[in-house]
Amino acid sequence: MTRFTYILFFALSFQCVCAQRYSRVHLDVSKTEDLSRLKEMPLALDHAHWKLEVGEVVIEVSDFELGLIQQADIPYHVEIDDLEDFYSKRLRQQQDIVWTKNVNCDSTSAPLDPTNFELGSMGGYYTYQEMLDDLDSMHSLFPNLISAKELIHTFTTEEGRPLYWVRISNTPDTDDPSKPEILYTSNHHAREAAALSINMYSMWYILENYATDEDLRYLVDNVEMYFVPLVNPDGWVYNQTIQPNGGGMWRKNRRDNGNNTFGVDLNRNYGYEWGGVGSSGNGNSDVYRGTTPFSEAESQALKWFTEQHAFQIALNYHTAANMLLHPWGYTDNFECNDHDRFIAFKSWMTEVNGYLNIQSSLLYEAAGDSDDWMYGDTSTKPKILAMTPECGTNSDGFWPPTSRILPLCRENLPQNLRGAYILLDYLRVEDLSSDALSVQGAIDVSMQRLGLPESSGFIVDLESLDPAVTVNTSAKLVSGLSYGESILDSFNYTIDTQSLSNPEVGFVLSVNNGTHIFRDTLYKRVSVVNPALSIDGTTLSPFENQGSSSWSTTTEDFVSAPTSITDSPNDDYENQTTQTLLLTPIINLSNAQDALIRFAAKWDIEADYDYVQFEALRVSSTGLPNDWLPLCGKYTNAGTADQDEGMPLYDGVQNTWVEEEVDMTEFLGDSIQLRFQLVSDNFVTGDGFYFDDFKIYIGGSIDSVINNVSDLNGLDKFATIIPNPAQHAIRLETTQPWMGQVQILNTLGQEVMNYSLDSESQQVHFDVGHLPSGSYYVHLLNADQITIVLPLWIQ
């Protein structure tokens, strides 16, 4: 200990924490010495929000801990004075709110909530008895899939409560040594309310979907899934007692330490590197580690339980930081031996919820936690690949609003299931191709070995569900991959447009591991292959800054040389700013049958706070606009309470270029405008948002696609087709001379005519009498890479 730490320990060690008040405070650690002192202090920094770019840490602390901060002379200000009162009032206000999905985004991959999962009576969270009743109901309804709740040996807590466990398996009453095992726990810390709900939700989902989901049935038949849903029952009941509507801030268990202090932090009481940094020997502290390793009945019970089994993976649920953490926690001086393996499978586990995938100590060093002991101590049990999900955002806090319970459960369900799939022979196969198909091309896929067992290989195949679509590539044998290794491949296809009855076509992408076939159905649509509007980022036009916005082209990075478009060229974006970039042409989808937008993008935006949205505005027939609607793409995620909550947006870090794709079919029949908008708060900033090669694809329209074409690159170049509809010949007239290419395409994107205008002209004649009756597009492409599209109807 430093002299500073000793002084604080003895000065405060005799204060009672029987009726502590908790506050949310912002610490100013812009000075290096203040940050160093903070890291030495016995505070629960594992749930702090670190904003070191602006020299700030946001933390929820007790009166005792606030006293430590004051004596350390670290500057701070209080955001919320009484957190129990704040959480309790917020939960009471939210009791009658029903959460609904983001209607702007495709939800086909979202789970259907289990019918037996219900919100509890404690602000939406379970009471202790409600949890026990639910475990009994699970066994009563699904006795062939889940065991009756059982005590962990004879261990009881300070207040006489046992710890319960259940097993989900197709043989739930038998411990089958041939099956790999995974452990799920919740609530080492009593106040982290969402953790219990997440695991109870997952259990109900597995039980209810076993009969109808082939992949889930394969998982349950071949893996034993163990749940200890409440590690800290005494602390949970204490919070229930002091705040029956939810919001209690007690973290530790309820041991009477004998010196007028109560409670041990169970996640500092494990034996691996016990007693080190991030824990305290002071019973007042929220990170009090106890008198000895495993001094507590709760940690003893978990130790004994893991020693009776051969768990390969463990997920110990906590809240809140939107992270999935792995060892080491006690030091950041080096990585664990399985660091690369953790990173590989955690990247898949967090694909849906977008949680940060890092080593625990990179957030904050903490000795004596569950993950380090499960992974590091192999003297009495095998090594366990243990992880800690920290679920929810900083604004969710320890007691998220009632309306956030289901979203948190939903976003962690794939994480729970994928953690179990890793125990099997598993190959991750991802479709990398566009949702819009040309008449012929390829479905590109990536394939990565993520299953822990050694594999003899996989057979990967793609089958068409439409007789008009032929897959020309045979099934592939994938073998010899090292763990986490990823390869790219493709399946070629052709489409017989004459026999195609529906523009939407389906494929089945399958992976056979020798004992089970995983199947994923891909839905694509045959659409126009040439864009109605193409902007290569060489100039800002036809985009236009709104107000004082400063979007511009940049040579910093691009997909197509020499520039792309970004919100803050050659610099980070500013704090407390809104930067809006409007696409000035109005897009007319009045008679379109299909619409799609693609652009290349990359970004560096403060996660959970700042964001960029790509939005559309319906322009009504009266000329009065409706509200701007955020658009959902392949790479958007739902906003937090500190952003546009629940709406699709871009945040976090995407360092490499990705091809974003936005389905616009919900706007068919409308005229719309489009814009990009960046919004920032007053703290951390980043490099911002870049996009390039922006293209709008329109299918099936017989009306003009782009209005206000005079705005394109500042050129007043508008074209007219006479006559239209036509039978034999057409005359194409432009208001100003035009030089470039003229293409005529059918609605499937096939080029049926091509004509070069080698000299500037305002009029050209075409014979179209040989074309079949129907809808066509006339594309005018100039040297500036601007495409104007006009409809043509042949009678």
Region spans (language model):
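Intrinsically disordered, low-complexity Pro/Gly/Ser/Thr-rich segments with frequent PxxP/GP/PP motifs
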Residues: 470-500
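Residue-level detector of functionally pivotal "anchor" positions at catalytic/ligand-binding pockets or at interdomain
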Residues: 427-437, 531-544, 575-576, 697-722, ...
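Metallocarboxypeptidase
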Residues: 28, 245-440, 470-471
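Terminal connector regions
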Residues: 495-530
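Extracellular beta-strand-rich recognition modules
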Residues: 589-604, 612, 671-680, 694
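C-terminal outer-membrane/trafficking sorting elements
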Residues: 4-5, 15, 19, 712-795
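Extracellular carbohydrate recognition
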Residues: 609-611, 680-699
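Extracellular glycan-recognition surfaces and repeat-rich motifs
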Residues: 531-580, 628-659
